[in-house]
Amino acid sequence: MLDMILAGLSEALQLANLLFVLLGVIAGMIAGAIPGVNGPMAIALCIPLSYYMSPVAAIGFLVGLNKGAFFGGSISGVLLNTPGTPESAATTWDGYPLAKQGKGEKALRMALYASVTGDAFATLVLILVAAPLAAVAL
C-alpha cells in the first residue's frame, strides 16, 4: 500500500499538476465567496474545462476547486454575515462580530487555519480508513 501512495504522490507533485491545483483553489475561493455558489456547483460548472487537461491535472483542479470553496465561503461569512457555502455557516457566529470590531483579518486567518487543519485531518483519515472499510464492505 505504501508503494502505491508514493507512486501517486510522485505523479501528483509534478509542477504542472500543482499549478492546476493552485488554480483550482483560487477559483474555488472566488466561487465560495459568492453566496449561493458552493463547491459541487463550482465543480459542475468547471467540468467542461477539465476535458482539456491531463487526467491527474483535472482531478487536482477539481479537488482544489472544492477545497478552495470550503474556505471561500467563510470570506462572505466573516465580512458580510452571509455564509457563501453551507460548510461555512459557523464562521458567521464568531467571525462577523470580530469583523465588526475591526479584527476581520484575524477572523479570516483563523477560518483559513481551521479549514486547512480540518481538511488535512479528514484526508489522512480517509487514506488510512478507505482500504480496510472497502474490504469490509465487499
Which residues are covered by each model-predicted region?
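Membrane-interface alpha-helices at helix entry/exit sites of multi-pass transporters
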Residues: V56-G60, P97-A114
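Helix-loop-helix hairpins and the membrane-proximal interhelical loops
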Residues: M1-A58, A135-A137
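Internal alpha-helical transmembrane segments of multi-pass membrane proteins, especially GPCRs
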Residues: Q14, L23, V63, L108-Y113
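Juxtamembrane transmembrane-helix boundary signature
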Residues: G60, G64-W93
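Membrane-embedded alpha-helical modules
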Residues: A107-L138
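Transmembrane helix-bundle signature of multi-pass membrane transporters/permeases
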Residues: M29, L45-P48, L62-F70, A111-V116
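Short helix-coil transition sites and intra-membrane helix breaks within transmembrane domains
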Residues: A31-M41, V78-S88, F121-V125
